[in-house]
């Protein structure tokens, strides 16, 4: 029997939990910015697996690293050393300009690790009374799906019927420095922010906001945690989005593109004063820092650096965003962009537009009902962007 997209979608819906609402498309092959379905139809990927595929699908260098390491050793656990963890931690420390790195697997694991580090630091270094440490988070955030992460959230879709939530969290309006100042208490350990909010619809904070957050954290002896899981590794036209304001957080949270689109790799990076709160047995991960992850991750960073994807994202993002802004359609409210991290907000829900774009060969996804996120692999060419713009115009103007 020939397996069709319809068969696969029906089987997935029957046997799988319905915690996602994907477009009716099945991806069976991928290369660069393009994917194919089982019927052989080609589509341009404008989502990049939520920015996990910045280097393009199946980049040859990353796949080669994966295969070579898979032929040697894939997993040792942290009960033993492996020969790539040392070089990988050094590489990551140099990249982030931090003393130490702690490897995990998924983005939300890195978020959890950062918050645990901040709480321990508050008790052991700052002197907060035990079990009283507080974390400040911003409305509209997305830090993941664990109970701790959704405790930071104010999104009803993410939080409904999952309580009780983790205590010690104060929420403030994103972009409002005065709100942060009012939320700070003697027990505040850290503030966690996305430098640009992704799931909220590519929300860019007011100019100077991150710099003021950095200054306030330094003044009040609070840690600044930057969740760069989605914005990191060249997505916004900088290696890390904090660089748009020349800001250095106390803790970097990294993931997604760190794994080159082929393996889950995440990490936090911080200086010794923070990292030294961890002692054997206080935190861990069986798969974190495994040799396969290290090999893939170093190749993923090589690709970003060797192919100059930071500048490519910056230049391509400006070109693509300008083209989107020039589209003549009165339903468009605003186009927000940093590099190839682009949100096109409409005055109405956009699910139907995404489905029509799929029919034209473009895969993108709505976020928060009224916004389409355009975040193609950073290897996209000018000709490919022009191809996409033509079809976006056709859908919107017809």
Curated annotation (Swiss-Prot):
Lineage, top ranks: Bacteria, Bacillati, Bacillota, Bacilli, Bacillales
Biological processes annotated in GO: L-proline biosynthetic process
One GO cellular component, as annotated: cytoplasm
Cofactor list: pyridoxal 5'-phosphate
Annotated protein name in UniProt: Ornithine aminotransferase
Pathway(s) this gene product operates in, as recorded in its UniProt entry: Amino-acid biosynthesis; L-proline biosynthesis; L-glutamate 5-semialdehyde from L-ornithine: step 1/1
Reaction(s) catalysed by this chain's protein: a 2-oxocarboxylate + L-ornithine = L-glutamate 5-semialdehyde + an L-alpha-amino acid
Matching InterPro entries: Aminotrans_3 (IPR005814), Aminotrans_3_PPA_site (IPR049704), Class-III_PLP-dep_AT (IPR050103), Orn_aminotrans (IPR010164), Ornith_aminotrans_bact (IPR034757), PyrdxlP-dep_Trfase (IPR015424), PyrdxlP-dep_Trfase_major (IPR015421), PyrdxlP-dep_Trfase_small (IPR015422)
Compartment(s) where it occurs, according to its Swiss-Prot or TrEMBL record: Cytoplasm
Function per UniProt: Catalyzes the interconversion of ornithine to glutamate semialdehyde.
Similarity comment: Belongs to the class-III pyridoxal-phosphate-dependent aminotransferase family. OAT subfamily.
CDD domains: OAT_like
Gene3D superfamilies: Aspartate Aminotransferase, domain 1, Type I PLP-dependent aspartate aminotransferase-like (Major domain)
GO molecular function: identical protein binding; ornithine aminotransferase activity; pyridoxal phosphate binding
Residues modified as N6-(pyridoxal phosphate)lysine: 256
UniProtKB keywords: Amino-acid biosynthesis, Aminotransferase, Cytoplasm, Proline biosynthesis, Pyridoxal phosphate, Transferase
